[in-house]
Design a protein with these regions (language model features):
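N-terminal secretory targeting modules
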Residues: 1-22, 37-200, 374-383
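Substrate-gating cap/lid alpha-helix
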Residues: 301-339, 364, 383
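Histidine-centered active-site loop/cap adjacent to the catalytic His
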Residues: 352-383
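Bacterial N-terminal signal peptides
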Residues: 26-36
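Oxyanion-hole/transition-state-stabilizing segment in secreted/luminal serine hydrolases
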Residues: 213, 225, 242-287, 298-305
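Catalytic nucleophile-elbow at a beta strand-turn-alpha helix junction centered on a G-D-S/GDSL motif
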Residues: 198-219
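Short helix-loop-beta junction
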Residues: 222-235, 326
Length: 383
């Protein structure tokens, strides 16, 4: 019997039916009792706590607002990117609780879902609970996508077994998060938890890194890489805006990181790659002289399959990327180029729109890049 609804049973008696019904009265009373218990469970009181009082992970540097990725009052960013800095992409709340139920109330902007994204990824929440040392999917906070689209209230999971749980709640991929409250059983305990990930790997890139077309908020490849490896992966993906700008290079140079992974060849043209690559690396190297810098070759976009214009643009871009990185590798032994071939496979089913990987696309991508990234990081004791 669902615990989300209340039920009322009406029994109408008359002289012709009274006796047959009376024969089944015990069964009716039992059914009524079960439904009453269900109604009582659905009305169990919930206590909400401000998620900002728990542990928020996933930021490269601290911010005044709890769910922003970059504090734009302190750091200059490229002109078109401040709004993306307010997206809590890759951020998560980690906490312990013995509650059998987890709910959430949260507030986003009122913008409509994008045409190539799932609303539950763009505006929703994605919960994982640790089981036998692994982060296991537990449920989602489904956003409201009618009306103003800005205030949401959802049951993420209920009827869990008793006992303490370690929880990892990913925040929306592609919308501003203004407020978040986590609801637990009134008499249960909920408390901050230490960051469960180790080291610090900053992943900077395009909409592919941002997670456009991922199925849930925790399914961008950097988040999956973190859960797979236990490494603390920071998502600094900015949809359409990663072209090795000096503002981003300056910001990254201030971040203490054990390694950087770059998806920085997806947005710029070959000309921009040739113009900006060396200056971008030079800025980061001033404060990170020996930190491993891992550059990913951009994906092969399906949009080039029949367009001669896109084919030419993409081919030239990929050639420029490889040439620039390999030339720099001649004088810098801590720079790496990861090009495992066709990142998204050859079956034409791994993107939402010819460019942005779906969960399947990210699986193909990780199958190819994760072993190489692990091998590189292992040289530096990053495991």
């Amino acid at each position: 019997i669902s615990s989300d609804y209340n039920y009322t049973i009406f029994v109408f008696l008359n002289t012709k039916t009274t006796l047959p019904i009376m024969k089944h009265l015990p069964l009716l009373l039992l059914l009524g009792g079960l439904l009453s218990a269900s109604a009582a469970r659905s009305a169990d009181p919930v206590r909400y706590v401000d998620a900002a009082t728990l542990t928020v992970i996933g930021k490269a540097l601290s911010t005044e607002q709890p769910y922003n990725r970059i504090d734009t009052t302190r750091f200059r960013v490229p002109a078109k990117t401040p709004g993306y800095c307010y997206h809590p992409t890759g951020l998560a709340v980690v906490f312990r609780t013995d509650s059998r139920t987890i709910r959430a109330r949260w507030e986003t902007s009122g913008k409509n879902p994008s045409d190539n994204m799932a609303a539950v990824a763009q505006k929703g929440l994605d919960l994982y609970i640790r089981s036998n040392g692994e982060w296991v999917f537990a449920g989602v906070g489904r956003p409201k996508i009618n009306g103003k689209n800005d205030r949401h209230d959802a049951a993420i999971i209920s009827n869990m077994a008793e006992g303490e749980k370690e929880c990892l709640l990913y925040l929306p991929l592609y919308d501003q998060l203004k407020k978040l409250e986590i609801g637990v059983d009134e008499k249960s305990v909920i408390a901050p938890m230490e960051n469960p990930f180790r080291h610090k790997i900053v992943v900077h890139g395009s909409s592919i890194t941002h997670g456009i077309a991922a199925g849930r908020a925790g399914m961008a490849y950097s988040s999956r890489l973190g859960r797979d490896t236990g490494l603390y992966c920071i998502n600094l993906g900015f949809s359409g805006q990663c072209t090795m700008q000096p503002e981003f290079a300056s910001y990254l140079s201030r971040v203490e990181a054990d390694a950087f992974v770059f998806d920085c060849f997806s947005n710029p043209s070959a000309e921009v790659i040739n113009e900006r690559f060396d200056a971008f690396v030079d800025t980061i190297r001033r404060t990170h002289p020996t930190t491993p810098l891992i550059f990913l070759q951009t994906i092969r976009r399906e949009t080039r399959n029949f367009s001669t214009r896109i084919e030419k643009f993409e081919r030239e871009k990929q050639a420029a990327a490889e040439a620039q990185v390999r030339d720099r590798m001649k004088t810098d032994k801590n720079i790496y180029f990861v090009d495992p071939g066709d990142l998204l496979g050859s079956d034409h089913i791994a993107t939402a729109d010819g460019t942005h990987p779906t969960d399947l696309g990210f699986t193909y991508m990780l199958d190819r890049i994760e072993p190489q990234i692990r091998k590189i990081l292992g040289k530096y004791g990053i495991r």
